[in-house]
């Protein structure tokens, strides 16, 4: 009888290790130690290429220019929002004041029995006409430019600010702002004073009221007959009181307007000087970097 063949070797048998078991377990341990899943025998990654000094200068300059471009876009957006706010304020103020002037001119009732001074009616009519014309001009500018600025400001895109006409129409926007706030307001104050004179001047002293400039011993009939010859009537007193109140208010308004304009110009001038100093500092740093590059290239040319 032939002997039975030996069973095949089993990998799980600890008494019969495989010839390649040690290398397999070693490779597994090396993978666990390495942590990145790559065998230790793999070649290392090549180092990043060295950046030359001119390339570094170019990269730094491009980064600074990109930051400068973003700051310019932010400045353009601020100007756009400022122009939009000015146009909105001008349109509201002009519509309100011009409407009030028109209503005041229409609703005023002139006394046909009273002899008005010829210059009073002329000045009142001219002031009302100029007031309405100035405010309507400012309202027309606001109505024409504001929709274009609103259409651009509602688009959520940084580059859309270039499509807005606020830079090109800057003079028109400032003109509308000046007409509505400065000239229009001064004309409105003058309109109020003239309206008081036109409205209250026909009022005369009643028959039983004595004249304040004459003794009260005179008869009432004589006072009534001589009321037009001397003294101040109640209408004149009311008009003078309104004028005395409005003149200091007008002076205060003018002083405030001049002070506000000077403060605003001073603020803008300081901002311009600050931006110029920043540009000068940037130019100085750029010049230093350029000279440093020249110094770094000089020894190589010397040894060559």
Curated annotation (Swiss-Prot):
Top-level lineage group: Eukaryota
Glycosylation sites: 225
UniProt region (AKAP5 association region), positions on chain: 39-60
Molecular-function GO term, any one: calcium channel activity
Ranges of Pro residues composition bias in the record: 1-11
Segments on the Cytoplasmic face: 1-88, 142-174, 259-304
Keywords: Adaptive immunity, Calcium, Calcium channel, Calcium transport, Calmodulin-binding, Cell membrane, Glycoprotein, Immunity, Ion channel, Ion transport, Membrane, Phosphoprotein, Transmembrane, Transmembrane helix, Transport, Ubl conjugation
Family: Belongs to the Orai family.
Name of this protein: Calcium release-activated calcium channel protein 1
Species: Rattus norvegicus (Rat)
């Amino acid at each position: 009888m032939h002997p039975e063949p030996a069973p095949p070797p089993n990998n799980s048998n600890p008494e019969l290790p495989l010839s390649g078991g040690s290398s397999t377990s070693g490779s597994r341990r090396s993978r666990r130690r390495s942590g990145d899943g790559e065998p230790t025998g793999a070649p290392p990654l090549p180092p990043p290429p060295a950046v030359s000094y001119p390339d570094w200068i170019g990269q730094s300059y491009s980064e600074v220019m990109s930051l400068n471009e973003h700051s310019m876009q932010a400045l353009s957006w601020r100007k756009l929002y400022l122009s939009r706010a000015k146009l909105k304020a001008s349109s509201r103020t002009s519509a309100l004041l011009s409407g009030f002037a028109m209503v005041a001119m229409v609703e005023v009732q002139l006394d046909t029995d009273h002899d008005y001074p010829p210059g009073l009616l002329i000045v009142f009519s001219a002031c009302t006409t100029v007031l309405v014309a100035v405010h309507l001009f400012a309202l027309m500018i606001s109505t024409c430019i504001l929709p274009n600025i609103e259409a651009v400001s509602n688009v959520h895109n940084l580059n859309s600010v270039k499509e807005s006409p606020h830079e090109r129409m800057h003079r028109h926007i400032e003109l509308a702002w000046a007409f509505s706030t400065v000239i229009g307001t001064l004309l409105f104050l003058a309109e109020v004073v003239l309206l008081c004179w036109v409205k209250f001047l026909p009022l005369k002293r009643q028959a039983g009221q004595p004249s304040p400039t004459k003794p009260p011993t005179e008869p009432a009939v004589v006072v009534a007959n001589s009321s037009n010859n001397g003294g101040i009537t109640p209408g004149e007193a009311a008009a003078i009181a309104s004028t005395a109140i409005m003149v200091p208010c007008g002076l205060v308004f003018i002083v405030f307007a001049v002070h506000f304009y000077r403060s605003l110009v001073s603020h803008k001038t300081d901002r311009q000087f600050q931006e110029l100093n920043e540009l000068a500092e940037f130019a100085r740093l750029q010049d230093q970097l350029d000279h440093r590059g020249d110094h770094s290239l000089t020894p190589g040319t010397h040894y060559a």
